[in-house]
Amino acid sequence: MGNPCHFALFDLQPSFRLDLEQLAARYRELARQVHPDRFADAGEREQRLALERSACLNEAYQVLKTPSQRARYLLALRGPELPLEVTVQDPDFLLQQMQLREELEELQDDADLAGVAAFKRRLKTAQEQLNDSFAACWDDDTRREEAERLMRRMQFLDKLSHEVRQLEERLDD
């Protein structure tokens, strides 16, 4: 069984802009249909296929619901697979990364929960701006380099957001 396009699994056209509530509802509907428990009395082959379909559906949902992963996937659909790790040749972005990490370290050192909350809001705004920028250029072949650069920035902000959530948990303890 080949892997169908993640978008096709959900009866969607490839697009960066998705209705996440609609995606979640469709996921729940499909998950019920392919859940391995529904095939408990079936033969071994059917059980294995149900497991594969369920795993494929779960992977597709995780990719489509996360903007940076959806961006990477869309770019891969339109061209060569992107390497997971790439040396970033963007000095402004590298400087921004260093500044954000330094700011987060200071917030951690100061155990500044209010500062962390403000930092998190700024990150969310930056992520929304990147999402808008990516949505405007991902399907334009003449702007592929820009789309790849934006996708890498999205991935960085995702990692940083994860670190912020971890810091919040540590400071809440």
Curated annotation (Swiss-Prot):
The keyword Chaperone applies. One of its GO terms (cellular component) is iron-sulfur cluster transfer complex. One of its GO terms (biological process) is protein folding. CDD domains: DnaJ. GO terms for molecular function: ATPase activator activity; protein-folding chaperone binding. Keywords: Chaperone. InterPro entries: DnaJ_domain, HscB, HscB_C_sf, HscB_oligo_C, J_dom_sf. It comes from Ectopseudomonas mendocina (strain ymp). Co-chaperone involved in the maturation of iron-sulfur cluster-containing proteins. Seems to help targeting proteins to be folded toward HscA. Interacts with HscA and stimulates its ATPase activity. Residues 5-77 form the J domain. The keyword DNA-binding does not apply. PROSITE patterns: DNAJ_2. Belongs to the HscB family. This is Co-chaperone protein HscB homolog. It comes from the Bacteria.
